[in-house]
Regions:
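Accessory C-terminal segments flanking Radical SAM cores
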Residues: 1-92, 96, 107-110, 133
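Conserved alpha-helical substructure of the radical SAM core
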Residues: 31-38, 78-172
Length: 172
């Protein structure tokens, strides 16, 4: 396995609850077009996003063993001795499917699509991005600790408020 390989770029598509395409659930970075505009499900097809310039560039970087900044969470996990999501088989098969420009003719075999964070549970392994109940709890803690609240907003990406009135920012 090359140090930067992740099978998700060959078999998985992730759509954040904001409607933005991302490489996977472990990154906060949105997939963007060549002008730096994020690709959104309302304006972009799955097919075009799957072989967008950014995705093709990242696939080629992975084939060449170059680091990908969007994948820093998994790299950090691995450096601590944990197995990350990107550690997977099929590297040679996926590399063989990749054209010289980084595109592939096969579509993803899995998709993760989130419509919001409305959830009546507060599972310990989850976060405010996926549970408004956890979000309400964190907002309560943040009333007395503004630094904590600023950190939570930064970590949550596009989610503004985690109350029963879900507010998600849609920037197209």
């Amino acid at each position: 396995m090359t140090k930067s390989y992740c099978a998700k770029l060959w078999n998985h598509q992730y759509i954040h609850m904001s409607g933005s395409f991302r490489l996977c659930c472990a990154t906060m970075d949105n997939v963007e077009d060549s002008n730096g505009n994020r690709l959104h499900i309302n304006n972009n097809s799955l097919e075009n996003t799957w072989n967008s310039d950014q995705i093709k560039d990242i696939r080629l970087k992975m084939i060449n063993g170059e680091s990908v900044s969007s994948c820093s969470k998994c790299v950090e996990q691995e450096s601590r001795g944990y197995k990350s999501m990107r550690e997977s088989q099929d590297m040679e098969k996926n590399f063989a499917l990749t054209k010289q420009d980084g595109s592939v003719d096969v579509m993803p075999t899995t998709m993760e699509l989130h419509f919001g964070n409305l959830c009546n549970l507060k599972c310990k392994m989850c976060g405010q991005q996926y549970s408004n109940q956890i979000g309400k709890e964190l907002l309560e803690i943040g009333k007395n600790d503004k630094d904590f609240l600023n950190w939570i907003y930064k970590e949550s990406g596009n989610v503004n408020i985690w109350t029963n009135n879900l507010s998600v920012e849609y920037k197209c």
